[in-house]
């Protein structure tokens, strides 16, 4: 079975075949770096990290581009509020982004272009659009895209021009010929910092948001590439506008496949600052370990809405603990995955059907159950290898199981285990039981086996 991906453009599952055999070129819209990453960013980063991992596991070379928007109205406002330069703000937020991504086990993209480094390419694309009659300079000095002159506009969102409304980031201005037209080049405003002003054939100004991704995508991956991804909130207007700009300029299909990850809710409500349920990745990592957060994201399908709650995170922690418990029973063998193995074949079938991580995770639990029964190092090795395709179970099992025991350090716990062993050797069962109960009250669960006693953190809840 070959890989099939749900293509937002066709609204159907399609067999995937890269334009260049064996080489997948993928572009994903990254962060606008004016603040810390939030849960929505975590969802997108993990989703497309899994995509690129599976493409590589399937034998493809992957060129993965995830851009950074480092010039934007929000960035300008935040820098002015903070009394710092835009470069200072964006550098700081990019460092924070990398720290958060590293914590979640996100592999770095092949390229991470900053919009401000590709202004010449943006100017070139705007010029091509103007030459083709698809762009014009308004009376206010801005250069706009003439939406109604591009015949394919609306094909991604599936709406006619009459249905479409100007999107959240598309400000309707006096200089536009049509409310649906969107800005390609913003003329400079007197109060704006000098560091956001570039010379252009249309006067000093800065690029619009949409042209940034079109120019960077074409520059780094070519005028036609394989996969373009991002959150569902970007489908319109951002991705619709990217298609119009890119295909309007080049006359070629921009991306073969368009992928969109689902929204994230908090306790069944949309996450927003106004509702007081807005969480940064760092907020969440204060309460839960990073692999639990990653597992919480991975075990839902990337296109499904994801509901964040303490109940779901604690459940994810407990589920991940069961997998690590299996790996703690026997040292996993180093194995090269045999995709004809029944469990590996089921895992592959799940991932090849639009990156079906819920079904793939179910296979991991089947293997964990087999490890619990057989104590097979080869089965444990297969479990670890398949989980690695999802960026999971690569840590030390005992370290994971023992994490979160804040009141007692490991040395104190081991001392109590030794005291309990001495009590049992002396047949002082009451003392041995007292120590076990005292540790349990501290959140420590003891596990006796013929090989000795181990411990782990008790499940929260």
Curated annotation (Swiss-Prot):
Subcellular location, record wording: Cytoplasm
Entry's Gene Ontology cellular component terms: cytosol
CDD domains to which the protein is assigned, alphabetical: Anticodon_Ia_Cys, CysRS_core
Cofactor requirement: Zn(2+)
SMART domains cross-referenced by the UniProt entry: DALR_2 (SM00840)
Keyword flag RNA-binding: no
Cell cycle as UniProt keyword: no
Sequence positions that bind ATP: 273
UniProt EC number: 6.1.1.16
Keywords: Aminoacyl-tRNA synthetase, ATP-binding, Cytoplasm, Ligase, Metal-binding, Nucleotide-binding, Protein biosynthesis, Zinc
GO BP terms, alphabetized: cysteinyl-tRNA aminoacylation
GO molecular-function term, one example from the UniProt record: cysteine-tRNA ligase activity
Top-rank taxon, per record: Bacteria
Motif ('KMSKS' region): 270-274
InterPro entries, per database record: Cys-tRNA-ligase, Cys-tRNA-synt_Ia_DALR, Cys-tRNA/MSH_ligase, CysS_C, Rossmann-like_a/b/a_fold, tRNA-synt_1_cat_dom, tRNAsynth_Ia_anticodon-bd
Cofactor note: Binds 1 zinc ion per subunit.
Assembly information from the UniProt record: Monomer.
Name of the protein described by the UniProt record: Cysteine--tRNA ligase
Species, as recorded: Delftia acidovorans (strain DSM 14801 / SPH-1)
Organismal lineage: Bacteria, Pseudomonadati, Pseudomonadota, Betaproteobacteria, Burkholderiales
Gene from which the chain derives: cysS
